[in-house]
Swiss-Prot record:
Keywords: DNA-binding, Lipid-binding, Metal-binding, Nucleus, Receptor, Steroid-binding, Transcription, Transcription regulation, Zinc, Zinc-finger. The lineage of its organism: Eukaryota, Metazoa, Chordata, Craniata, Vertebrata. This is Estrogen receptor beta. Binds estrogens with an affinity similar to that of ER-alpha, and activates expression of reporter genes containing estrogen response elements (ERE) in an estrogen-dependent manner. It comes from Oncorhynchus mykiss (Rainbow trout). It is found in: Nucleus. Residues 1-177 are annotated as: Modulating.
Length: 568
């Protein structure tokens, strides 16, 4: 006599129990259809897992399963239990899987309705059975017009390990990680994205006891699991990633709080754009809502520096050979030609500095008119920093001190340029620091702005200072990446900022020299360069008489305005 296996007993028991259940009138049971493609000798193999483990014998007759999904009004097409495409196995060999995972629920592998399988559940025109429990591993079926993502959600939930929020899509897009330990960041604290633990640790360290000593070699790994193992290395990494006591706390608070704040800012900015007689001329930028809420571009220092570096203008070539010996007219013609070309690119560069184009057109013009020679001189120093004793005006024009002495009155300016360049060389100026200093010169050149205390003027100035603070934070962050101690970073920041005053002094010297050359008719000036020079002289004369700066554009500003308006 054939002895029935335990699996057969269980199958028969389940089959008889289900077929003996009472069905309300008009209902029909679901049937598991025979599988021909995977049957081997009365056994069924998994379409996914092709292993050497013994297959399970299954009775040949259909097994009836009571359906809780009756009379839903949907035409449920065939739903295969397993789908290689859904699991992401691709075209990998089926033999790679060594065993069948019996714990997996079949509902995890339901694909969209467009796929057809020989193993299917057929639903007839029936109605929902009242008060019938929907137990087991069966999940709620959805209408056939839903997208494929609806059926992938259970699998995604098992794989993804992210926090659930009310606005999950926006929350995942805004997800940041702690720059110190790589845990989930709770906000932007002390100048970087950081978690609550590292924020609190840094706060305690800068407010009190911080003379930590590393028991090893000051190279301990600081991550989510080992951040508490060494306080000295943790504090060192806080400084390395850019955490600072004086850092502007952008995006402060949780993600939900920042979302509410951004909505308030959007409403405020909308009112600014649509109100006032000058709404067409002045574009709104984020500005302070109150004394404690500082609003800015919401860019991290690293992102801001990346944007400014991408805005750097291309190299300018003179495109002609200068015959030696150099003459005063020859040198001045070449230098003014290069300066005029650089001015066009400088205006394009300024408009790519984050937040600059959001200032009023009046402020943009005045800032450029006040700083243009400082920006050109800083660029000259940066190109010359690796060439001691020479000034690299362009890749095809470099002058030594002796070659520049042919221009009357130029030796003093030449020596000052070489001295400032030598100082940058001693400091080993980095490119990130250079672009920050360049942007600071642009935004800090407000000597020609009106000194009136009107509400509109104060608002414009606050917008400008907000941008300047952001660039200053970026410079502090760039210095922190050099690996210096806190005291050394503070000293380096002071040295770099002090050089800006020397560059302004150099700019005034150069402007006076260029004006003298113009008055002596030693060299013709090009349109844009001439407009910039006249504007600087006009602003200097107005400041000497303590007169207010008019808000209307004059004829001197026409060239600058035309270049700015072309790209606005």
């Amino acid at each position: 006599m054939h002895q029935q296996s335990p699996v057969d007993d269980v199958t028969a028991l389940n089959s008889s129990a289900l077929t003996m259940s009472e069905y309300p009138e008009g209902e029909s049971p679901l049937q598991l259809q025979d599988v021909d493609s995977s049957r081997v000798g009365g056994h069924i193999l998994s379409p996914i897992f092709n292993s050497s483990s013994p297959s399970l014998p299954v009775e040949s007759h259909p097994v009836c399963i009571q359906s809780p999904y009756t009379d839903l009004g949907h035409d449920f097409t065939t739903l295969p239990f397993y789908s290689p495409a859904l699991l992401g196995y691709g075209t990998s060999p089926l033999s790679e899987c060594s065993s069948v995972r019996q714990s997996l629920s079949p509902t995890l592998f339901w694909p969209p309705h467009s796929q057809v399988s020989s193993l299917a559940l057929h639903q007839q025109h029936t109605r929902l059975q009242q008060n019938h429990p929907t137990g087991g591993t069966w999940t709620e079926l959805t209408p056939h017009d839903h997208s494929e993502e609806e059926y992938r959600k259970p699998l995604v939930k098992r794989v993804a390990d992210a926090e659930e929020t009310s606005t999950s899509l926006r929350g995942k897009a805004d997800m940041h990680y702690c720059a110190v330990c790589s845990d989930y960041a709770s906000g932007y604290h002390y100048g970087v994205w950081s978690c609550e633990g590292c924020k609190a640790f840094f706060k305690r360290s800068i407010q009190g006891h911080n003379d930590y000593i590393c028991p090893a070699t000051n190279q301990c790994t600081i991550d989510k699991n080992r951040r508490k193992s060494c306080q000295a290395c943790r504090l060192r990494k806080c400084y390395e990633v850019g955490m600072m006591k004086c850092g502007l706390r952008r995006d402060r608070g949780s993600y939900q709080q920042r979302g509410a704040q951004q909505k308030r800012l959007a409403r405020f900015s909308g009112r600014m754009r649509t109100s006032g007689p000058r709404s067409q001329e002045m574009k709104s930028v984020p500005c302070p809502l109150s004394g404690n809420e500082v609003v800015n571009m919401a860019l991290t220092p690293e992102e801001l520096i990346a944007r400014i570096m991408d805005a750097e203008p291309p190299e300018i070539y003179l495109m002609k050979d200068m015959k030696k010996p150099f003459t005063e007219a020859n040198v001045m013609m070449s230098l003014t030609n290069l300066a005029d070309k650089e001015l066009v690119h400088m205006i394009s560069w300024a408009k790519k500095v984050p937040g600059f184009v959001e200032l009023s057109l009046f402020d943009q013009v005045h800032l450029l008119e006040c700083c243009w020679l400082e920006v050109l001189m800083l660029g000259l120093m940066w190109r010359s920093v690796n060439h001691p004793g020479k000034l690299i005006f362009s890749p095809d024009l470099s002058l030594s001190r002796d070659e520049g002495s042919c221009v009357q009155g130029f030796v003093e300016i030449f020596d000052m340029l070489l001295a400032a360049t030598s100082r940058f060389r001693e400091l080993k100026l980095q490119r990130e620091e250079y672009v920050c200093l360049k942007a600071m010169i642009l935004l800090n050149s407000n000597m020609c702005l009106s000194s009136s205390e009107g509400g509109e003027e104060l608002q414009r100035r606050s917008k400008l200072l907000c941008l300047l603070d952001s660039v200053t934070d970026a410079l502090v962050w760039a210095i922190s990446k050099t690996g210096l101690s806190f005291q050394q970073r503070s000293t380096r920041l002071a040295h770099l900022l002090m050089l800006l005053s020397h560059i302004r002094h150099l700019s005034n010297k150069g402007m006076d020299h260029l004006h003298c050359m113009k008055m002596k008719k030693m060299v013709p000036l090009y349109d844009l360069l001439l407009e910039m020079l006249d504007a600087h002289i006009m602003h200097g004369s107005r400041l000497s008489h303590s007169g207010p700066a008019p808000k209307e554009s004059t004829g001197v500003q026409e060239a600058t305005l035309s270049v700015l308006k072309n790209d606005l």
